[in-house]
């Protein structure tokens, strides 16, 4: 049962990956439309990507911990 739980926990890594892809695509479009706002958009994009990546790492660690029990 632990391995099933670990596999389900690792599905949580897919969400942040999709989120980062959408975030990057929309930020690139926004910078293309308004180049003057690029520094602000880039900073917000990096913060959002870091938060999403943190969730992915947390799901990965939970999956590893469940697999090792």
Residue ranges and their predicted role:
Residues 1-69:
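Hydrophobic, small-residue-rich transmembrane alpha-helices and their short perimembrane loops
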């Amino acid at each position: 049962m632990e391995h099933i739980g670990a596999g389900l926990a690792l599905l949580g890594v897919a969400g942040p990956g999709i989120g980062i892809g959408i975030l990057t695509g929309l930020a690139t479009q926004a910078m293309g439309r308004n180049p003057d706002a690029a520094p602000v958009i880039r900073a917000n994009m990096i913060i959002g990507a870091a938060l999403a990546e943190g969730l992915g790492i947390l799901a990965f660690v939970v999956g590893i911990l469940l697999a090792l029990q």
